[in-house]
From Swiss-Prot:
EC id: 2.7.8.26
Topology of the protein relative to the lipid bilayer: Multi-pass membrane protein
Function, in words: Joins adenosylcobinamide-GDP and alpha-ribazole to generate adenosylcobalamin (Ado-cobalamin). Also synthesizes adenosylcobalamin 5'-phosphate from adenosylcobinamide-GDP and alpha-ribazole 5'-phosphate.
GO cellular component: plasma membrane
Gene: cobS
Keywords assigned: Cell inner membrane, Cell membrane, Cobalamin biosynthesis, Magnesium, Membrane, Transferase, Transmembrane, Transmembrane helix
Source organism phylogeny: Bacteria, Pseudomonadati, Pseudomonadota, Betaproteobacteria, Burkholderiales
Organism: Polaromonas sp. (strain JS666 / ATCC BAA-500)
Protein name: Adenosylcobinamide-GDP ribazoletransferase
Amino acid sequence: MNPISQFVREYLLAVQFFTRIPVVGRLADWVGYSPELLRASAGHFPGVGILVGVMAALVYGLIQALLPNTPFTPLVAAVLSTAATVLLTGGFHEDGLADVADGLGGSQDRERALEIMKDSRVGAFGAMALMLALLGKTALLAMLGSVDVSPAELGDDASFSSWYIGAALLTGHVVSRGLPLLLIWLLPHVGNTASSKSKPLADQISQGSLLVAFIWSFVVLALAGLALDAISLIVACSFSLLALLWMGALFKRRLQGFTGDCLGATQQVCEIAFYLGLAVSL
């Protein structure tokens, strides 16, 4: 199979695995499935973030355009935009965050924590983590959507502000899906490899997949630079990187490695950290 066809197959499998977008019929037959193919598709996680980010940006912009301009409009747009991303992904990453919070919050013992993380029920720590994550995300997005970020020469340009929040959402979803791949590179997989949702990712991620993820992220960051200034991007990416390092250190200390839930939790934390970095740099 030629490289372009292989690239498309890997990307579509990543879309099928990490979103609710249907890949069915002849297309699904063409894409196929194997643990090796899914493992190779890891490099396309940031590419999946493009789809999620575009959906989030479209919903945010549509709500702002339809509703009257009030102080609460950005908040409504942020809530519905976040809800749209949860529907698109099936809450895949949010589920990981809840499981990690329940496991690490429910027991100091490594084995017991891993056992709790396998329980599909949401406990008190998981519920609190989900609530704080969703509140934090929507609050930051509402703030970013309500601040005038237009350059002085443009004045109060509503269209520029729309491009700004759209670029923020797109970049946040892409960067936050690229960084967790470094956990696969740096830490061993400690989940139940036989049944874990991250089974195909249990082996070390290849340098080729990391390169693909870097290319996806670099292209989006370059395009985002048309709406976000360089300083804001650097600060936001730095916040996400610090969040990744903190999560990685936590997993290494408490679990001696990572699970699929850890990857989802890290995506959520890195995304929130990205928006926080943008807010700080305003």
